[in-house]
């Protein structure tokens, strides 16, 4: 079981990859899951827009798309591919007054929370997602 990081025609490098993987393992455990094979693919805004159209039928930009490959039959191991648009993450960081790395960590944990079953489609579930992101970002600060 591993966390892997890839680039899809972009040059982003996530710092502290091992520490990030350990943090994500703790997040999954806190949510009642075990972290399995999870891949992060960093890509452009255009690439994620194309994927959003093709796979989800949405014609808009987004910062993250999570594909869940977890086997829910009797196991609590999560697995999946998490595609992150580094351009939109940087734009969002500026908009929200965060650093690019802080916003990237938020999006990274957001993907794992989706694998753990957290939805964000309604105002209520979106607020729950945001509270969990904040909680686990505090975990990160303790890891540093």
Kindly label every feature range from the protein language model.
Residues 1-105, 115-144:
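An acidic/histidine-cluster motif and surrounding catalytic segment
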